[in-house]
Amino acid sequence: MSTKPVVIRFFAPVIDATVNALMSAVDQKMKQGMKDFVILISSPGGSVIHGLSAYNYLKGLPASITTHNFGSVDSIGIVLYCAGSRRLSVPQARFLFHGVNVQFKGEQNLDEKLLEERLNGLRIDMENIAKVIAANTGKSAKDITDAMFERTTLNPEEAQSWGLVHEIKSELFEAGSEVIAIQFQQQPQQLPKM
């Protein structure tokens, strides 16, 4: 068995398919006795429920998790990044904080109770995200919420001063390491045939 950590390159949005692929890859390697993981992350964000679930899953494992921003970690991607007990970033990276939103489909009718339910859900999501990031940095939940409302972008040095990044490092993994790729490609639209 290799003594090198398992490297997982997560170059994808945080959605059902990619989070399930991440958890499956970790599960499979843990069944093989691996307990040391490096998750390389570059993500535009995505689904709050999937991001919080992935965070809780990775944090709850009897494994060593290192996360490494190799490009841009945005929105709920920051929560996934916080799953690392050791958090690294390349020098040319960024972290984007912004608030949670909800999308309504078509001409959906919303009564007062449904609007209230959606608004309460947004507030709880914001609180949960802020609590996770605050628990893993030197910032308070209010500081994080303010950063989200202000749509704050941090470079690696700023993220390090917040306690979000532990070390700025260009090297992603050792030569000869196994790399598992998780990516998402949207299917191209089919043009009508003539």
How does the language model describe each region?
Residues 1-76, 82-194:
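N-terminal organellar transit peptides
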